[in-house]
Amino acid sequence: MAAPMELFCWSGGWGLPSVDLDSLAVLTYARFTGAPLKVHKISNPWRSPSGTLPALRTSHGEVISVPHKIITHLRKEKYNADYDLSARQGADTLAFMSLLEEKLLPVLVHTFWIDTKNYVEVTRKWYAEAMPFPLNFFLPGRMQRQYMERLELLSGEHMPEDEEELEKELYREARECLTLLSQRLGSQKFFFGDAPASLDAFVFSYLALLLQAKLPSGKLQAHLRGLHNLCAYCTHILSLYFPWDGAEVPPPRQTPAGPETEEEPYRRRNQILSVLAGLAAMVGYALLSGIVSIQRATPARAPGTRALGMAEEDEEE
């Protein structure tokens, strides 16, 4: 019997099953199609088989880490949300996907990762609280730098140098995109009628993040809340496909009293290695930046093993 497919994705918050755009899109598509996945909602990307999130481990052991490729694999496994679409609807899907990536993705990156107030009070706060020590000290900042580079690539050569002008242009195009989506959806349940398709999975992931996060600087959020059919669309998908999801940072898993399970030694090993890697990174940074210098002195006793007592919490659901 083949092993089950396993999906590794960022854990949930803000009333959503995942706070990450790509993870949310893949999760939603899987729910739409009823794909039998063993889902691991985690807050440590190092525990993913690819080192990134989301990632799919197939029944044959192959690891796929690009959202579109994950969905393509699910289609090959006969979990195809677009099976009943016409050729024209397929073309519309491609057109709207391009529109989302060109007009809405840049402003989503700006809203959560570039806007200082939102980043400090919402984005960094969530990741710092959800991630295990010591990743929470440096990984959110590294992710922010990666998203800054991503925004530059998305904006291309036409990216205004003036920050205020860039923000004005991004939000203007995003508002136009949302209005167009609202007009296209109309009074339908989904974009192509009564059944969800892959386009719905991606549109929902964009809209739900904007709607659900409590943003102190929510310019686009205010515009979206004025488009009542899009708000009802997100509420409908959440209640129908994720009725039990969307909790805040999951509590640590309770370890049952009694004999050690078969996986326990490996879990402890991974916890210790994770802590050692994090400590090594922090010490290396301190030495390179000059925060700490090494001087000759009388050798001191090495710290005992109790220093390794803090290990990451198991965020898996």
Curated annotation (Swiss-Prot):
Keyword Cell membrane: no
InterPro entries: Glutathione-S-Trfase_C_sf, Glutathione_S-Trfase, Metaxin1/3, Metaxin_GST, Mito_Protein_Transport_Metaxin, Sam37/metaxin_N
Transmembrane segments annotated in the record for this chain: 164-184
Location relative to the cell: Mitochondrion outer membrane
Biological processes per GO annotation: mitochondrion organization; protein transport
Primary subcellular site in the record, as a coarse category: mitochondrion
A Pfam short name: GST_C_6
UniProt keyword terms in alphabetical order: Isopeptide bond, Membrane, Mitochondrion, Mitochondrion outer membrane, Protein transport, Transmembrane, Transmembrane helix, Transport, Ubl conjugation
Covalent cross-link Glycyl lysine isopeptide (Lys-Gly) (interchain with G-Cter in ubiquitin), where: K38, K41, K78
Modification note: Ubiquitinated by PRKN during mitophagy, leading to its degradation and enhancement of mitophagy. Deubiquitinated by USP30.
GO cellular component: SAM complex
Keyword Membrane: yes
Recorded superkingdom: Eukaryota
CDD domains, A to Z: GST_C_Metaxin1_3, GST_N_Metaxin1_like
Job description of the protein: Involved in transport of proteins into the mitochondrion. Essential for embryonic development.
Assembly and interaction partners: Interacts with MTX2/metaxin-2. Associates with the mitochondrial contact site and cristae organizing system (MICOS) complex, composed of at least MICOS10/MIC10, CHCHD3/MIC19, CHCHD6/MIC25, APOOL/MIC27, IMMT/MIC60, APOO/MIC23/MIC26 and QIL1/MIC13. This complex was also known under the names MINOS or MitOS complex. The MICOS complex associates with mitochondrial outer membrane proteins SAMM50, MTX1 and MTX2 (together described as components of the mitochondrial outer membrane sorting assembly machinery (SAM) complex) and DNAJC11, mitochondrial inner membrane protein TMEM11 and with HSPA9.
Family that this chain belongs to: Belongs to the metaxin family.
Name assigned to this protein: Metaxin-1
Species: Macaca fascicularis
Lineage summary: Eukaryota, Metazoa, Chordata, Craniata, Vertebrata
